[in-house]
Amino acid sequence: MSKEKFERTKPHVNVGTIGHVDHGKTTLTAAITKVMAEVRGGEFKDYADIDNAPEERERGITISTAHVEYESEIRHYAHVDCPGHADYIKNMITGAAQMDGAIIVIAATDGPMAQTREHILLSKQVGVPYIVVYMNKADMVDDEELVELVEMEIRELLDEYDFPGDDTPVIFGSALKALEGDISDIGVPSILKLVDALDSYIPTPKRDTDKSFIMPIEDVFSISGRGTVVTGRIEAGVVNIGDELEIVGIKDTKTTTCTGVEMFRKLLSSGEAGDNVGVLLRGTKREEVERGQVLSKPGSIKPHAKFEAEIYILSKDEGGRHTPFFNNYRPQFYFRTTDVTGACQLPDGIEMVMPGDNVKMRVELLSPIAMEDGLRFAIREGGRTVGAGVVSKVTD
């Protein structure tokens, strides 16, 4: 039995392990659950549990992900670990597992490798804000100078992708020794040090209700004598009766006022993140609003049509395309609640994109959508999902 009841009072932070294949991500994940279960209660997950991660489907894409949880003195952590390299890429691009911070695992015996670099770049592109380093397999290196070299190399690599290399915590240890209960510095204490680094280096994320109000519009009705009602699920923030709001995307931005909030046929004085509501708008005609626009706090989000994106294209086995696509491919981009056609520009030197590939590209939409960096979307052809992506940079 676990020693203490799970408390919902601690702030919740999402993290995950990233890094090159066989550098010890899954062993480290198991070691953290074991050490923290002994210190704080909770459940120990062994290597096999994590490695046999069930397949999940996110936007039609098959991803194997293991979810574990543990508590530190001040926080509750939800931690994701993926068995395969492709799973990481899919996970990060679809946002199936949003990370407030990542633990990059690097074998001291190898130093940073190709996938280490790719995961750091992807973290930057998809907006993982903080990275902590665990230098693993410390039990297999005797050469102090080699360790310092690897540490220097990883800090430089982080700098290269605009992470603060000099300030990043680097913890030196052996996940395997920690899992075996070894109490020398590189064993259990290295895990405690790592969790301390997560606590102190990754800030507590802003709660959704503290962010600016935004609600993607799913449907529009007019109620005679009362005006226009838009319905949807509030993505972030809070809306109160009397608030001035903007309707953003597709058409020119319009200003309106909230005169009522309804949920399950009951009138509320306000609605907050996560609520499915109807918002009554004053002075707005039904034909001025459509699905795919968003209702937002004035000035908080702007419409854009051009952006750079990091994209994953489904493989044939995932129900995606059977053939590659080329420059100027024009699928539909599904943002929040609607499809908008856009043209794709491939990077120099890339002639085509095969099913199962991930690629960075520039996109220009036919009509603008309320958008900011980090927004996720699906790529569709005639209602069938053929890819997923994330806006890495708005360019207009």
UniProtKB/Swiss-Prot annotation:
Gene3D superfamilies found in the cross-reference section: P-loop containing nucleotide triphosphate hydrolases, Translation factors
Binding site for GTP: 19-26, 81-85, 136-139
Primary localization: cytoplasm
Start and end residues of each tr-type G domain: 10-206
Record region (G5): 174-176
Ranges where the record places region G4: 136-139
Binding-site residues, Mg(2+): T26
Renumbered residue ranges of the record's region G2: 60-64
GO cellular component: cytoplasm
Residue span of region G3: 81-84
GO molecular function: GTP binding; GTPase activity; guanosine tetraphosphate binding; translation elongation factor activity
Catalyses which reaction(s): GTP + H2O = GDP + phosphate + H(+)
Keywords, comma-separated and alphabetical: Cytoplasm, Elongation factor, GTP-binding, Hydrolase, Magnesium, Metal-binding, Nucleotide-binding, Protein biosynthesis
Residue ranges, annotated region (G1): 19-26
Location in or out of the cell: Cytoplasm
EC number(s) per entry: 3.6.5.3
Subunit structure, interactors included: Monomer.
Job description of the protein: GTP hydrolase that promotes the GTP-dependent binding of aminoacyl-tRNA to the A-site of ribosomes during protein biosynthesis.
NCBIfam families per record: EF-Tu (TIGR00485), PRK00049.1 (NF000766), PRK12735.1 (NF009372), PRK12736.1 (NF009373), small_GTP (TIGR00231)
Similarity field: Belongs to the TRAFAC class translation factor GTPase superfamily. Classic translation factor GTPase family. EF-Tu/EF-1A subfamily.
Name listed for the protein in its UniProt record: Elongation factor Tu
Gene source species: Vesicomyosocius okutanii subsp. Calyptogena okutanii (strain HA)
Gene: tuf1
